[in-house]
Amino acid sequence: AGWLREAMPQDLQATLADTRWPDGALVAMQTAKDQNIPGIIDAEAPVAEASEALKIASHIAFSEQGAEDFTGLSDPEQAALEAAKSLSGQVIVTAGERGVVRIVDGTAVWHQAHAITVVDTLAAGDVWHAAFAVALADGMDEGDAIDFASTAAAIKCARPGGRNGAPTREEVLNFSA
């Protein structure tokens, strides 16, 4: 992944990586840290191999499975609280139709999911993480970024097709459930 460090632009506003390529995730998170920009990890199981990247990420957004893999706890809120004990970044767990939980000053804060008719969940997590990264890059605070990302994922789930169902920024901003 050494080549990735050289290939990273210097004018980034955020980085997003997942745990499937631990070396690449580490480079992306170190770049974010060095540039003082958000570094978001899509923490999907198995997460152990990406532990160094998780330690320096500014935002660790676990799936339920990723949070359970990291902590051994199946309850998203308890897993988030436990993960926050060993990670310095903002800990978030996406929990599908139940919403998203994040840890703020040691307390679990839930963001409710939109009530929609689900058509297809393929790529919903990827849409959520990408929208979250875009929102942080745009300067939104974590709460608003989570809401923006959750809206994007809800729109995607209400449509068929994986990435073809991903909404535009305008669709997310104009959405009302």
Regions found by a protein language model. Give the residues of each.
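Ribokinase/PfkB-type carbohydrate-kinase core domain
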Residues: 1-108
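Conserved phosphate-binding/catalytic region of the ribokinase-like
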Residues: 48, 75-177
